[in-house]
């Protein structure tokens, strides 16, 4: 029996990288997965990977910067699979600028995708998590099961990162949201935790080519490697496994935790 057998999970930013790895890993462990990404091509590719392995998924291209889109996504997932048990708030982008060059447009964009989407998706999940637990408490005195919310923050919120004032502010906001929701939702047996990846091999950390919006200079990549005790960059699957642990019954007494997945990176 899989560690998430019979559970229904929503994973945002699931078209690539950490989100895709998490959605696939959850499906391998028995969860039905709502695969959310604003890019329909990558989202459908993730669903195809899940389906090829015998798993169940539903693709959603909802742009959860809008609350209504988040509500529609959760409703569709509950209609398709009967419930919502797990939320993985993973959607994120970087748009790097030194602070004196940072404008409102880039500030708002990065805060929207990294933080506002997490607020909307989690808020839209309350009827399926908190309200479901309240009904169980009214009937029996206690919630029937633990339900789970996880976030992807970043080790950059701990260390700071030159050129990423918008990104680190958003990821710091995720930490505050995680710890506050852990307190608010704990009485309903809803565990709320976050994973803080270090340097993970994704398109956001690939060597930046001239004209690219994302990626980082190769010199910075090599400097980052020198700070990692385990001597390698992380892979999306490393982070997916952390989300899986926190979403599983093995973590039923863990809440409000920020779990670094950084290979012993200095400062984490």
Identify the meaning behind each predicted range.
Residues 186, 191, 254-256:
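Short, small/polar-rich loop/turn modules that mediate ligand/substrate recognition or access, typified
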Residues 197-207, 211:
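Short, flexible catalytic-loop segment of classical short-chain dehydrogenase/reductase
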Residues 154:
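Residue(s) in the substrate-gating loop at a strand-loop-helix junction
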Residues 122, 170, 178:
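Active-site helix of classical SDR
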Residues 40-41, 61-73, 104, 237-238:
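The beta1-alpha1 cofactor-binding region of Rossmann-like NAD(H)/NADP(H)-dependent oxidoreductases
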Residues 159, 242-244, 255-268:
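Short C-terminal tail/terminal secondary-structure segment
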């Amino acid at each position: 029996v899989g560690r998430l057998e019979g559970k229904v999970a929503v994973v945002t930013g699931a078209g690539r990288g950490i989100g895709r790895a998490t959605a696939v890993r959850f499906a391998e462990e028995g969860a039905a997965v709502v695969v959310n990404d604003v890019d329909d091509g990558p989202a459908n590719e993730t669903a195809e990977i899940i389906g090829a392995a015998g798993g169940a998924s539903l693709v959603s291209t909802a742009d959860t910067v809008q609350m209504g889109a988040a509500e529609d996504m959760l409703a569709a997932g509950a209609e398709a699979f009967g419930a919502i048990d797990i939320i993985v708030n993973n959607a994120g982008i970087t748009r790097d600028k030194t602070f004196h060059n940072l404008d409102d447009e880039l500030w708002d964009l990065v805060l929207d995708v990294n933080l506002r989407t997490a607020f909307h998706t989690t808020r839209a999940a309350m009827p399926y998590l908190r309200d479901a637990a309240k009904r169980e408490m009214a009937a029996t005195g206690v919630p029937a099961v633990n339900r789970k919310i996880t976030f992807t923050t970043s080790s950059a919120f701990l260390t700071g990162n030159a050129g990423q004032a918008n990104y680190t502010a958003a990821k710091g906001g995720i930490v505050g949201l995680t710890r506050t929701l852990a307190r608010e939702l704990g009485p309903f047996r809803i565990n709320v935790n976050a994973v803080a990846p270090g340097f993970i091999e994704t398109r956001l950390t690939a060597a930046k080519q001239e004209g690219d919006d994302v990626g980082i200079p190769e010199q910075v990549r090599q400097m980052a490697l020198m700070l990692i005790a385990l001597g390698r960059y992380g892979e999306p699957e490393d982070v997916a496994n952390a989300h899986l642990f926190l979403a599983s019954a093995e973590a039923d007494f863990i809440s409000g935790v920020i779990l670094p997945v950084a290979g012993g990176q200095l400062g984490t």
